[in-house]
């Protein structure tokens, strides 16, 4: 068993759907979790596919919710965005950017390869101070409500296995191989240092 609670981060593009669904499920299971996005702005589906609604990361989930409610209650209820923002508001005030976080984690899950690349690049650009390892694991999760939920449960299962592991460093590769076979997904994995 790990001597302390596993510290987990989940990162997607905007810190709205995939990372927050995982945040919600991991938190309910009692895990120490934070969630983040990596882009410069939060982008939500707009009136047309090529016209997203764009917010600054300083905008709270409640402000986004109220803005979309005013713009088109029916559209944003139907596509699930109001439900997502309501859930998010119950977890934390607003989205956070990974690049602005100075906390350390044991494991960071990313939800798409471009986010994985950004997280690894950011960690490698920081000055190493403690040399504490952090495992960065990418799992491709489509940005849909259903896929976010399925991905969150898989992340939760991996975290619970790691939490029960006698030696995370030795067991992680084998665990990821088992999960790849079980889920039919392949994972990217690397180790960075704080």
Curated annotation (Swiss-Prot):
Keywords: Hydrolase, mRNA processing, Nucleus, Protein phosphatase. It is found in: Nucleus. The keyword Hydrolase applies. Gene3D superfamilies: 3.40.50.2300. The keyword Lipid metabolism does not apply. Its EC number is 3.1.3.16. It holds the Pfam family Ssu72. GO terms for cellular component: mRNA cleavage and polyadenylation specificity factor complex. It catalyses: O-phospho-L-seryl-[protein] + H2O = L-seryl-[protein] + phosphate; O-phospho-L-threonyl-[protein] + H2O = L-threonyl-[protein] + phosphate. One of its GO terms (molecular function) is RNA polymerase II CTD heptapeptide repeat phosphatase activity. One of its GO terms (biological process) is mRNA processing. It is an enzyme of class 3 (hydrolase). Belongs to the SSU72 phosphatase family. Protein phosphatase that catalyzes the dephosphorylation of the C-terminal domain of RNA polymerase II. Plays a role in RNA processing and termination. This is RNA polymerase II subunit A C-terminal domain phosphatase SSU72 like protein 5. The lineage of its organism: Eukaryota, Metazoa, Chordata, Craniata, Vertebrata.
